[in-house]
Regions:
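Flexible, acidic/histidine-containing loops and adjacent segments that form or flank the divalent-metal
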Residues: 1-3, 59, 81-132
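Conserved beta-strand hairpin/beta-sheet module of binuclear metal-dependent hydrolase folds
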Residues: 1-63
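Active-site metal-binding motif and surrounding structural segment of the metallo-beta-lactamase
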Residues: 26, 41-104
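Solvent-exposed loop/turn segments at secondary-structure junctions
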Residues: 35-38, 72-76, 110-112
Length: 132
């Protein structure tokens, strides 16, 4: 049984890869994407290394079992936006998509409990949260 948590260099943000499963069938979970520079400096190189480790051809996608976004602060979100933007561009240009998210989970607990404090903080934000 394989279970490792890898913290990628995200400077002041968070970008974690959870590896689980077995040596013959490893699986990956991405937790947050870090700030903008994290994608090119840490996340993309690590995902490319995983593609090589799994011996994927250029036409095969690296499967990311679950992508988790804990909250929409830029130091958790921006790297993830770049990941999805790259996949979108590849699809538009009819190129192979290098990484495929099987499922996406966004922490909406505060929305569920109708946390008024969170709503007040969000209304004070200077810019809207980017959409994925």
């Amino acid at each position: 049984m394989l279970l490792t948590l890898e913290a990628l260099n995200a400077e002041e943000g968070d970008c974690l890869l959870l590896h689980h499963g077995s040596a013959t069938e490893p699986r990956h979970i991405l937790i947050d994407g870090g700030p903008g520079p994290t994608y090119l400096l840490a996340l993309k190189p690590r995902l490319e290394a995983l593609r090589k480790l799994h011996r994927l051809s250029a036409s095969q996608s690296l499967s990311i079992e679950l992508v988790v976004l804990t909250h929409t602060d830029e130091d958790h979100l921006d790297g993830m936006v770049q990941l999805f933007d790259e996949a979108r561009k590849a699809k538009e240009q009819k190129h192979p998509i290098p990484y495929r998210a099987e499922r996406i989970w966004y922490n909406t607990f505060d929305d569920i409990i109708q946390n008024k404090e969170v709503a007040a903080i969000q209304s004070l934000a200077t810019s809207p949260s980017p959409e994925i």
